[in-house]
Every structure is written in structure tokens, then in C-alpha cells.
Amino acid sequence: MVGKASYVRFPLLFRPILERLMFDFDATLPLMAVQFLILTVILNALLYKPLGQALDNRDEYIRTNLQQAKERLQQATELANQYEQELAYTRREAQAIIEEARAEAQKIATAEIAAAQQALQAELMKAQAEIDQQKQATLQALEGQVSSLSEQLLAKLLA
């Protein structure tokens, strides 16, 4: 409680306020303020600065890792795009090679078919020539036989 001696120093206007206060305005108040300031300085030096520095270091670490991750993601995206372009180019080249091989095979097949047709045509002409030759030989043989038979028939009819 506030003693009567402390009222003498303060005007009567502050008396109701002072009666409600739980501590005296004496030498302990500045001592408590100094203790609070010393505690604040000690906590700042031992706790808040290292904690703040650790948080700053962690923030810098996260920021650095995030930046590196973004750079790696960008590099990976660029590589993926490059590989996709190379793959598309390779596919176009492969398709062109396939089409070229297909055209070459078609050309070879057409040439072989033409050669086979020519060979077949030559065989056919050769066979036709043989048939014509045999026909001529047969006709000549028959003409010889017809004239011989005609003479025999004429001789039998006249006889």
C-alpha cells in the first residue's frame, strides 16, 4: 500500500490515482526499468539476434534453393523441348527414308515385272514362231499328201 509520506510529494489531484496503484514510486521503479532494459539487451543478444539470423539464413537458403529449382526446371523444360524437336526431326527423316525405300522397292518391282513381261512376251513369240513353223511344216506335209491322195483317188475313180 501507498504510505502517507508519498502523498506529500505529489499534488492532491493525483491522490486518487496513487491510492489505486499497487506499487510505490520510489527507487525500485528505476531499478526495475534498468533490470528490464538489461534483460531486453541480454535477450536481444542471446536469443533474438541469433534467432533472427537463423531465420534470415533459412530464408536465404530457401530462396537460393527455389531459384536453383526454377533454373533447373527451366533447363529441363528447354532440354525436353530440344529432345522433342530432335525426335520430331528424326521421325520426319525416318519417314522420308521409308518413303524413299518404298519408292525404290516399287521402282524395282515395276522393273522386274516389266522384265518378266518382256521375257514372257519373248517366250510367247518364240512359241508362236514354233507353232507357225510346225503349222507350215504340217501344211506342206498335208499338201504333199493331198496331191498324192488326189492322184490315188483320181486313179481309183478312173479305174
Curated annotation (Swiss-Prot):
Q: Which GO terms describe its cellular component?
A: plasma membrane-derived thylakoid membrane; proton-transporting ATP synthase complex
Predominant location category: membrane
In the UniProt record, does the keyword Thylakoid occur?
yes
- Pfam families of this UniProt entry? ATP-synt_B
Can you name one GO molecular function term for this protein? Answer: proton-transporting ATPase activity, rotational mechanism
Signal peptide: which range, if any? none
**Transmembrane ranges?**
27-47
UniProtKB keywords:
ATP synthesis, CF(0), Hydrogen ion transport, Ion transport, Membrane, Thylakoid, Transmembrane, Transmembrane helix, Transport
Membrane topology term: Single-pass membrane protein
Localization per Swiss-Prot or TrEMBL: Cellular thylakoid membrane
Which InterPro entries does this one have?
ATP_synth_b (IPR034679), ATP_synth_b/b'su_bac/chlpt (IPR002146), ATP_synthase_B_chain (IPR050059)
User: What's this protein's function?
Assistant: F(1)F(0) ATP synthase produces ATP from ADP in the presence of a proton or sodium gradient. F-type ATPases consist of two structural domains, F(1) containing the extramembraneous catalytic core and F(0) containing the membrane proton channel, linked together by a central stalk and a peripheral stalk. During catalysis, ATP synthesis in the catalytic domain of F(1) is coupled via a rotary mechanism of the central stalk subunits to proton translocation.
Query: Quaternary state and partners of this protein?
Result: F-type ATPases have 2 components, F(1) - the catalytic core - and F(0) - the membrane proton channel. F(1) has five subunits: alpha(3), beta(3), gamma(1), delta(1), epsilon(1). F(0) has four main subunits: a(1), b(1), b'(1) and c(10-14). The alpha and beta chains form an alternating ring which encloses part of the gamma chain. F(1) is attached to F(0) by a central stalk formed by the gamma and epsilon chains, while a peripheral stalk is formed by the delta, b and b' chains.
Q: What is this protein called?
A: ATP synthase subunit b'
| Gene source species | Synechococcus sp. (strain PCC 6716)
